[in-house]
Amino acid sequence: MNFRLLSQYHADIKKLIKISLPILLAQIAQNSMGLADTIMAGRVSSTDMAAISIGASIWMPLMFFGQGLLLALPPTISYLNGSGQHHRIAHQVRQGIWLVLGVSIPLGLLIYFCEIPLQYMQMESKMSDLARDYLHAMLWGLPAYLMLINFRCLNDGIEKTKPAMVITFLGLLINIPLNYIFIYGKFGMPAFGAVGCGIATAIVNWAMCLMMIFYSYTNTQERSLKVFSQLIEMPNPKTLKKLLRLGLPIAIAICCEVALYALTSLMLSPLGATIVASHQITLNTSSFIFMFPMSIGMATTILVGQALGAGSPQNAKKIGYAALLLGLTVTIVTALITIFFRYEIASIFVTDEIVIAMAANLLLFAALYQFSDTIQMVVGGILRGYKDTKVILYITLFSYWVIGVPLGYTLGRTDWLVPHIDAKGFWIAFVVSLTFAAFLLSLRMKKMQAMNDNAILQRLEKLK
C-alpha cells in the first residue's frame, strides 16, 4: 500500500467515508426489510415465499427505474450548493415532486396490470394470485417511496446522508412488527400471508416518506432553502427536461443491469436446481458486496458536483482519484474475504455439499469481478457529478448486452468456443463485460478531466 498516496488524499477520503457510510448502512437496512419479508412469509408456506420472490422480480426493476430518474437531483443540487446558488435548490426539489407524480402513474399501471406477465410465467394459480395481490398491496406505497427518494436526494445533495440512514433503520423496526401483524393475523387482523408483507411495506413507505419530509421541514439548514415556502409550484418544462435528460439514462442503465442478472437466471434455469442455486448464492453475495462501491460512487457524485459548482475542476479531479483509491482499497479487503471464506459464505445459504462446492468455485470469479465493478461504479459516480450520464448508458448497453449476454450464453450454454461450462461461463462473461465497462468509463472520465477548466464550467452552466 502506498501510504504517501493515502496521505495525499487523506482529507478527501475522510469526507467520502463520512458521506458514504450512512448511505451504505441505509442500503443494508433497506435490504434487511426484503430479507425479513422473505423469512417471515416463508414460515407461512413455500408458496407465500415464492410469491414474494416473483412479485419482487416485477417490483424491483420498476422501482429502480423511478429511483434512477430521481438520481438526476443529487448532482444538480450538489452543484447548486457548491456554487452558492442555494435559492435555486428548492425549485429542483419541487420539480422533483412533479417527476414523482408523473412517473408514479405509468409505473402504477404496470404494477396494477401485473397479472398479464404473471400469466406467461407458467406457475400455479395460487402462487400467481398471491404475487398479484402482494403487488397490488405494494402499489399503495409506490408514490410514498418515490417521494421519499426525492427528499432523500435533497438531503444527499447538501451532504446530509445520515437522516436517510436513521429513517431507513426506523422503517426496518416498524416493518418487522407490521409483518408479524399482517402476515400471521395478530391483534384482530386477518392472516394475509405474503400479501401482508405488501401491506406492511406500503405502510412503512408512507411512514418513512413522512419522516423524511418532517425532517426536511424542521431542519434549520433546509428551512433556509425555503423548499416548503411555496405549497404549489407549477411544472416547469425546461427544468423537467433537464432533469429527465440527466435521469433517464441513469434509469435505463440501472434497468439494463437488473435485467442482465434476471435474464442470466432464466438462461441457467434449464440446467437444474443445483446450478441455479450455486449461481443465486454467488449473485446474492455479490449484491451485498456491491453496496460498498455503490455507496462510494453516490458519495463521489455529491462531492464532485459540489467541487464543480464551487468552480474547482481540479478539486473535482482530486476527489475522483481519492474515491477510486478508497473504493479499490475496500475491494481488496472484500475480495480477500470472498476468496478465503468462500466455503463458509456458501454454507450460510445451503447445507448441500455439491451446491456449496459449486458456489465456492463461482465466488472466485465474483472476487475478481469486484475490482471491475468498483471501478465502473466509482467512475460512473464521477461522471454523474459532471452530469455526463448519456455515455454511462451507451457504455452499459454495449458492455452488458453486446458483450456480456452473448458471451455468457456462448460459454455457459453452447459448445461453440469450448465445451459448455454452465454458470461459470456466465460469471466469466460478467468479469469480461464489467472490465470493458470500467475501461470505457475510465477513458470517458479522463477525457472529461482533460478538458480546459473554463470549458468544463461553461458546459455545466448550460446544464444547471
Swiss-Prot record:
Presence of the UniProt keyword Cell membrane in the record: yes
Molecular function as annotated in GO: antiporter activity; xenobiotic transmembrane transporter activity
Membrane topology recorded in Swiss-Prot or TrEMBL: Multi-pass membrane protein
Cell compartments where the protein resides: Cell inner membrane
InterPro entries documented for this protein: MATE_fam, MATE_MdtK, MdtK-like
TM annotation in the entry: 16-36, 51-71, 96-116, 134-154, 164-184, 194-214, 248-268, 288-308, 321-341, 348-368, 391-411, 423-443
Major subcellular location class: membrane
Pfam family, one: MatE
Keywords from the named record: Antibiotic resistance, Antiport, Cell inner membrane, Cell membrane, Ion transport, Membrane, Sodium, Sodium transport, Transmembrane, Transmembrane helix, Transport
A GO BP annotation: sodium ion transport
Family: Belongs to the multi antimicrobial extrusion (MATE) (TC 2.A.66.1) family.
Name of the protein: Multidrug resistance protein HmrM
